[in-house]
Amino acid sequence: MVSKRIQKALEGNSAIRAMFNEGREMAAKYGEENVFDFSLGNPATPAPKALNDAIRDLLDEADAKGAAGSLGIHGYMANAGYEEVRQAIAENLNERFGTKFTAHNLVMTVGAAGGLNIIFKTILDPDDEVIVFAPFFGEYRQYAANFDAKIVIVQPNLETFQPDLADLEAKITARTKALIVNTPNNPTGVIYKPQTMEQIGAILEKKQAEFGTDFFLFSDEPY
């Protein structure tokens, strides 16, 4: 018998995932060209040729080294990910944004969902609050519930779908632990304006001073 927590989670299984599965079944029945899938934000374009070529090169190099090379490709690695990969990402970020990251500032995870769950496990206590901007990716609610925390929803401006910043300020409490910013947004595709982001930062600083707490700001950027 599975736990009551999992039973409850299964009863409220992701509508987005259900739509995706239904879409796959309909595509098999009626043809891919006749079904338009607006569920998961799945990539609709192939991987760049340069990426495919780089993967082939890695596999060819591994084959040339024999068993040792093969183990280097599919064996265990450091928990944070390959250091040379993290360093390359850090250098790219530094070049683009004028930051000073090193490999030690980065941790690689298997997808953003895994990353968010790890972070939530690290920072959340029961009844802590995580703020999201509506409309939002529905799985955020379950990620918080995994650690007995609560999602607090900030409403949008229905004309622009930018966050209602007055509502944000009203929703922050002493139990607020984190805010998730997802831009371009899933599901609307809206990109939050630079001035919106600046105002969000100012509100967070104001509320941190008011409550004497620290908030974590998560930027979820799959798109």
Task: Give residue spans per PLM region.
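Walker B catalytic acidic pair
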Residues: E221
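Conserved core of the PLP fold type I
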Residues: E61-G212, F218
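N-terminal small-domain helix-loop-helix segment of the aminotransferase-like
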Residues: V2-G111
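A short pocket-lining beta-strand/turn micro-motif at the edge of beta-sheets
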Residues: N34, T213-D214
